[in-house]
Amino acid sequence: MRLISKKNLLSAIESYPDAQSAIESWYQLIKDNDCQGLEFVRNGYSRSVEQVYGYTIFNIKGNQYRLIVQINSRTKIIFFKKFFTEAEFSKINWNDRDEVKQKLGEIFT
């Protein structure tokens, strides 16, 4: 899998150094595997993984953070969308598609 944009992932590490090890573990799993979709990711990543409106949400560092991406299994590309603390993440109304789009940006197809 190829990550677009690794720069944003590194920025998350810089902003939240306590999450560095967990983020790097996630990245290594993604980089080393030829992702076949959400089920493959769920099987390879022992922490909670959710999917909402085409976004895949990973719990990072014992549920302290959320890493949100879009996975395109066909092109084998993962688009980094956002990295939130649990407090930031919980403020988003996940039942409101427009709010989610506003916070995370457009879905790539």
For each feature predicted by the language model, list its residue ranges.
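Basic, Lys/Arg-enriched alpha-helical interface segments
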Residues: M1-Q64, S73-I77, E86-T109
